[in-house]
Each structure stands twice: as C-alpha cells, then as structure tokens.
Amino acid sequence: MNPNQKIITIGSASLGLVFLNVILHVVSITVTVLVLSNNVTGPNCNGTIIREYNGTVRIERITQWYNTNIIEYIERPSNEYYMSNTEPLCEAQGFAPFSKDNGIRIGSKGHVFVIREPFVSCSPLECRTFFLTQGSLLNDKHSNGTVKDRSPYRTLMSVEVGQSPNVYQARFEAVAWSATACHDGKKWMTVGVTGPDAQAVAVVHYGGVPVDVINSWAGNILRTQESSCTCIKGDCYWVMTDGPANRQAQYKIFKAKDGRIIGQTDVNFNGGHIEECSCYPNEGKVECVCRDNWTGTNRPVLVISPDLSYTVGYLCAGIPTDTPRGEDSQFTGSCTKPLGNQGYGIKGFGFRQGNDVWAGRTISRTSRSGFEIIKIRNGWTQNSKDQIRKQVIVDNLNWSGYSGSFTLPVELTKKGCLVPCFWVEMIRGKPEEITIWTSSSSIVMCGVDHKVASWSWHDGAILPFDIDKM
C-alpha cells in the first residue's frame, strides 16, 4: 500500500470502532431501562420514604421519581405526653462523672462566652447546660468588669450537656441575669429575670416563645433559682425571692402549665431566709435545698406539694453545708431555725435518701474552694453527725463555686426511679485571681449503684489570659 491507502484504511477502521462503541452504549441503556421497568422485586421508585431524625424538629419526606427527588419538609409534632416525674429518687452509692465542659481552657483560644451560674436540666431526649452569659467572649476587651451580677447584656443560653458555652453551638433562651429552666415532656420552659433592681421582670418562655410575666412585688432584686425548675405531670414549679439579701425577704412558689402561671403561694418563713433553691422531684413532690444568705450556715429545706401546700424548715443534719461556716464539731443542727450566725452564703444542694441525705459543700469553711459530697445517716430528719460516706469532686487547692441538683428522667434511663445528679461550678478570674474578667466552667456528676473514688475534676485553665496583660 502506498501511504495514502494506509491513512484511508486506518481512518476507516477508527470510524468503525467509534460507531460500534456508540451502538454498544445504546444497547446498554436500552437493556437497563427495560430491566428496571420490569423488576417487580426491586425498590419502588415511585414511593415515599419517611425518615425521622431525633436531632431535628422536622420529618424529611422524600418522594422519588426515578432520578428526581422532590423534598418536602413538614413540622414534626411535639411530644405527645407530659413527663410524670412522680417516681422516687434512686438510691446512690456514689456519683460518677457525667460531663465536663472545660469552657475556660477552650476559651483561651476559642469563641467561648464569659458566663456564670451554669446549671443542667433534662428533657425526655437530652440534657442541656444552661448558663448566664455576659454578652462577651473570653480573652476579649468586653470581658472587662464581668464580675458584676446584673447588666442589660446578660442572657440565658444553653448547649448540649458537655459542650463548652461556645458561640457556634449555643442556643438563645431568654434575656436574663437570673434564671431557671425545665422540660415538661413536651417543651422547654424558661424563666428569665431582667430589668432594673427596683422593677425587675421575670419573663416565662414556653417552647421558645414569651407566654407570661412576673413583676417584682417587693422592689428589691427579684431573683430565682439559678438551677433547674421541676415539672410533675405537666405542671412546673419554681421558687422566687424578692427583698434584702441580708435580712428578712419575701418568698413565693410559682406553678405553671404550658408556660402560663396557674398558681402561686407565699412562703411564710419569718426569721429564715431563702434564696437560690436547688430542687428536684421525689415521689410526686418537689424537694428543695436552698441558701440562707442572712444568718444560717445550715440550709433551708422547702417541700412543695402539687396543690402548692408546703413545709419549710432547715436541713436537720448536725453538719453545716453552707459557706462560710464554723467547725463541724461546734455545730449542733436544727430542723426549724437558722444556726451558725454567719452571713453571706453560696448556692448548694442536697438529696433525700429515705431519712438520710447526700449534701454537697465546699471543702474550705471560709472560701469557695474545693468541693465534696457527704452522706449523713438520718440527716434529713435528725441532728445527726453520722457521716457515712464522702466523695471529693474538686480538691481544696482549686476554686469551686455554686452547685445545684437535677434528675435524669426515666424516659432517658429506662429505670423505675429518678437518678439524682448535681453540677459544680468552678469560678475563675475576679475577685480571687488577677484578671479583668470573671467566668466559670462546670463538672456534672450522676448517682450510680457503686462507690466512686475521690479525685479533683478542677477547671485547670492557666491564667492570666492575653487580654489581662494588656
């Protein structure tokens, strides 16, 4: 062959191969369509698939038409039932770590809020950490002066338990410098107190929407629990204080359903002082262990019935659990009156276990450092000094702070009793350390059927931050 014939032959062969390739593709597509259209055992391409995601608030409905997806979003209905919360507390032999947020350590380089007063509360699906922000971030100029309790910048926000109070995962709840929150089984209810000291207002949110308000009745810093409120069979209960922090004030119990106040009662407690109650459900009642900021180093106890009748007194145990306090050996205990003659105080908690009590307290008698929980035999009903168990949570070389109670509902645990849990705030910065800010992180513990070793789950942040050196 001459060169021209070779070129023509090669070109013809190439065109033939291309034509054959096209025919093979057409045959392949035709066979595929015929097989899929006649495959009665295959998936229904014309059907509807429902996928429900617990982590969202919607149902995803996907209608499939061959390779075309039409996606519709329909609102997920709210939970059908209220939580009962009438079960007894589980007996706890010790307390195991549930979560630790390490917010201040992370906040040295991360976008973490300056906070105080963190607390935990649970729904049938999850537990959340609530906290009062200062409208500023750690290691930022706006953190200056955040030792102040009340300002127009403070808000109640929340994250899933264990997460740091960071900008990216936090959910806004209410404008507040004092707050409480709880879940009735259907929706979250929050109570946020804000406004001027003499005319503060508490706004009740239900499902994220403002539903009701409580105006200051005594004109002296209306305030509430700084820990979880308590819902029983759809009714939610919490305690509020209005009046002086260092002498007789006024106290009220509130009851709400779906965020609307349906009842309230005054607590008659002449000579006693109630603030910042830590409450939990137990056998159909609400049991609260509170703070006496006037004179007592023993803690007030308030037990609330569904009809808003109540009993009020003091934790009977012969061991004091407030701070500051005197020596254990010099304390006698009383079920009815304040003892100790020590002003000031700190938010704390206790759990009734039959006639016994688990009670938390700082290890230091004079400052907010260290934390331990002790079990006192017959301490709920008698002036007992019989300390039968102790577990250290934060050693006395490290700062602690407020502490409070909550329970794990049976819907979460599948138990026949409510698991007692508590959190400990670990305050860092002013007034004890050389910084321009005050903030905190927290450790959360829950009751278990076994003894748990003492350790120190302290905050661990290295101070000062860069902003403190400027």
Swiss-Prot record:
GO CC list: host cell plasma membrane; membrane; virion membrane
Residues in the Virion surface compartment per record: 36-470
Superkingdom classification of source: Viruses
Binding site for Ca(2+): 292, 296, 322
Compartment annotation: Virion membrane; Host apical cell membrane
Disulphide-bridged cysteine pairs: 90-417, 122-127, 182-229, 231-236, 277-290, 279-288, 316-335, 421-446
Ranges for region Involved in apical transport and lipid raft association: 11-32
Regulation (activators, inhibitors): Inhibited by the neuraminidase inhibitors zanamivir (Relenza) and oseltamivir (Tamiflu). These drugs interfere with the release of progeny virus from infected cells and are effective against all influenza strains. Resistance to neuraminidase inhibitors is quite rare.
GO molecular function annotations of the record: exo-alpha-sialidase activity; metal ion binding
Membrane topology field: Single-pass type II membrane protein
Family matches, as InterPro entries: Glyco_hydro_34 (IPR001860), Sialidase_sf (IPR036278)
PTM characteristics: N-glycosylated.
Assembly and interaction partners: Homotetramer.
Designated name of the protein: Neuraminidase
Gene field: NA
